[in-house]
Amino acid sequence: MASTQAQKALETFERFLASLDLESYQQKYRPIKTVEQDLPRELNPLPDLYEHYWKALEDNPSFLGFEEFFDHWWEKRLRPLDEFIRKYFWGCSYAFVRLGLEARLYRTAVSIWTQFHFCYRWNASCELPLEAAPELDAQGIDALIHTSGSSTGIQIKKETYRSEAKSENRFLRKQRGTALIEIPYTLQTPEELEEKAKRARVNGETYRLWAKVAHHLDRLENGFVIFRESYVKSIELFLQKNAPTLSGLIRWDRVAQEALTAP
């Protein structure tokens, strides 16, 4: 059984997610896309996000609000920030650039918080050990799940209907034979997706697959979408049955069809 520590970490993290004023953040940051350049390594927020929000081994974890997190990140990087601003935003005020970076980091943080919830939920509900670290994240791996004799990467896959080019993940290039599983995730409700499937002239089956995914997700009162226990347990069972034979990229639609149970 999962530890009391893991369950407590999950509950504490969910309380943090529920405390976020998502509507205010969206109104403030959604229109702002002034900082779209690739950030230099010195400004990479991933190590800070892991430091402040991935606390799976702590007995009494606590989590910073986004504003406090951003203040910490900003104050630690005054010199590289000054160089970045002089290079790309000469003549602009620090306030202008700061707001642009706030919006940029908020979008990154929401994505990271989502994958962290999957990891906290996994630790609280599953037996297979999970590993998460910024070094893995930099390779496109949200977490590693260890089975007997192998390790499988996971990557949260947000809902999309665009055709995508098939490109090999950096992690898979470095470790031949290792599998990477896409974990489908949608912000839409099952009812919304079922209705779209009924009305669709194309993509009807895809909408139905996403509706199946949505049945394994839940929504906090503020609208943040989180993973149900049924989701991670379905993925664990899929890995226990198939891990030795999995290799390469396991796309989200196969996961939805074979791993997730129908409602």
Curated annotation (Swiss-Prot):
InterPro entries: Restrct_endonuc_II_TaqI. It comes from the Bacteria. Its EC number is 3.1.21.4. GO terms for molecular function: DNA binding; type II site-specific deoxyribonuclease activity. Only 15% of purified enzyme (upon expression in E.coli) can be sequenced, suggesting the remainder has a blocked N-terminus. Keywords: Endonuclease, Hydrolase, Nuclease, Restriction system. GO terms for biological process: DNA restriction-modification system. It catalyses: Endonucleolytic cleavage of DNA to give specific double-stranded fragments with terminal 5'-phosphates. The keyword Hydrolase applies. It is an enzyme of class 3 (hydrolase). This is Type II restriction enzyme TaqI. The gene is taqIR.
